[in-house]
């Protein structure tokens, strides 16, 4: 009996983990934390040419409505506490994408006294998107990597 036979009878069997993770990957709501030129590429990814809506990704203005934070750009020492505060306001489960060389490790400003050498020193990062600035395609690749990571996580303790 194939899937067609099961659908005719009105039921499908699966695990709760798979259903929950499928729903989470199909409705990711990122909050933009644009700090520099990478934010322009992030905005371009949400525009009509790339259309992140087809992946179920809708940008949210509030951290309380988001489950993904995209950190795009140079993180300075004065902005680090604000980043942590916004991250703490996000509901669980939450994920972070670090976009661009500056967010990943400080970029060109790595040795500056006022730059945090990677946002992973402030918040836990799930996916790193390389580039300076990374293209919209690279951000979409990073989002797809995060979706792959979410699909393989266990949501229910065993």
From Swiss-Prot:
Location in the cell: Cell inner membrane
CC terms in the record's Gene Ontology section: plasma membrane; respiratory chain complex I
Keywords, sorted A to Z: 4Fe-4S, Cell inner membrane, Cell membrane, Iron, Iron-sulfur, Membrane, Metal-binding, NAD, Quinone, Translocase, Transport, Ubiquinone
Top enzyme class: translocase
Single GO MF descriptor: 4 iron, 4 sulfur cluster binding
Catalyzed reactions per annotation: a quinone + NADH + 5 H(+)(in) = a quinol + NAD(+) + 4 H(+)(out)
Subcellular location, principal: membrane
Keyword Membrane (UniProt): yes
Bilayer topology term: Peripheral membrane protein
Any GO BP annotation: aerobic respiration
Cofactors demanded by this protein: [4Fe-4S] cluster
InterPro entries (alphabetical): NADH_UbQ_OxRdtase-like_20kDa, NADH_UQ_OxRdtase_20Kd_su
Keyword Transport applies: yes
Comment on bound cofactor: Binds 1 [4Fe-4S] cluster.
Enzyme Commission (EC) number: 7.1.1.-
Ligand binding ([4Fe-4S] cluster): 37-38, 102, 132
Signal sequence extent: none
Oligomeric form and interacting partners: NDH-1 is composed of 14 different subunits. Subunits NuoB, C, D, E, F, and G constitute the peripheral sector of the complex.
Summary of the function given for this chain in its UniProt record: NDH-1 shuttles electrons from NADH, via FMN and iron-sulfur (Fe-S) centers, to quinones in the respiratory chain. Couples the redox reaction to proton translocation (for every two electrons transferred, four hydrogen ions are translocated across the cytoplasmic membrane), and thus conserves the redox energy in a proton gradient.
Similarity-based family: Belongs to the complex I 20 kDa subunit family.
Name listed for the protein in its UniProt record: NADH-quinone oxidoreductase subunit B
Gene: nuoB
């Amino acid at each position: 009996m194939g899937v067609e036979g099961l659908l005719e009878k009105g039921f499908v069997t699966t695990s709760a983990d798979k259903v929950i993770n499928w729903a989470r990957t199909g409705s990711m709501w990122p909050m933009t934390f644009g700090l520099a030129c990478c934010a322009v590429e992030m905005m371009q990814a949400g525009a009509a040419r790339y259309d992140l809506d087809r992946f179920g990704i809708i940008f949210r203005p509030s951290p309380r409505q988001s489950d993904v934070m995209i950190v795009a750009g140079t993180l300075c020492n004065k902005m680090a506490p604000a980043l942590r505060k916004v991250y703490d306001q996000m509901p669980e489960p939450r994920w972070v994408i670090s976009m661009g060389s500056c967010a990943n490790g400080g970029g060109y400003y790595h040795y500056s006294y006022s730059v945090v050498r990677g946002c992973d020193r402030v918040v836990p990062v799930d996916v790193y998107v390389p580039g300076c600035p990374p293209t919209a395609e690279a951000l979409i690749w990073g989002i797809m990597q995060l979706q792959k990571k979410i699909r393989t996580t266990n949501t229910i303790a065993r």
